[in-house]
Amino acid sequence: MRWMLILFLTLAFTVLGCTPTDQPVSREDVLNNPDKYASQEVEIEVKPGEWLTDWDQAIAVAKKQKLPILVDFTGSDWCIWCKKLDSEVFSKEEFINYAKKNLVLLKLDFPHGIPQSDAMKAANKKKMNKFNIEGFPTIVLVNAEGKEIARTGYRPGGAESYINHLQDLLTKQNDIK
């Protein structure tokens, strides 16, 4: 009887352990366990309005959602104008609600005191060079293929004014097509 119970439990755990799930994997799980997912193509769950930090992931989301990407080149822990842009615009409910429906958000950070992996530093530096970023904050709007649409930076006036500015930049690009 005991052997049958052990055999049953072993089979049950084997079958349940091998059952695939259709649940998306959280971004944090992939970032915290890169070896676990290194050989797999994983669909990462991204919440609308959430800031991404990986270029390739942002491109994939933009293609899937058919949205432009707002790339924030920032020095989040030392750049005064970056901090102002974050506190006056990016952290406001108006902007967050707008971004959820209209943008993929990508933050490429160049901090002085916040630890980053060497891979992230190199990837961010590569994009900084590609887009000829000379100062912070620089906001670059790109399409789902990564081609620059427009660029801007800090602007006074708060979230509503900034949203209008972004819409103008995106509308001008659509008018050119």
PLM-predicted stretches and their roles:
Residues 15-17:
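C-terminal motif of bacterial Sec signal peptides marking the signal peptidase cleavage site
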Residues 74-90:
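Conserved redox-active cysteine motifs that mediate thiol-disulfide chemistry
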Residues 19-21:
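Bacterial signal peptide processing site
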Residues 88, 129-175:
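Non-catalytic, surface beta->alpha helical segment in thiol-disulfide oxidoreductase systems
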Residues 1-5:
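Positively charged n-region of N-terminal signal peptides that target proteins for export
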Residues 66-69, 74-78, 135:
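Short pre-active-site segment immediately N-terminal to redox-active cysteine/selenocysteine motifs
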Residues 51-69, 99:
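A short beta-strand-turn-helix
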Residues 49-52, 88, 92-122:
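Thiol-based oxidoreductase modules, predominantly thioredoxin-like and allied folds used
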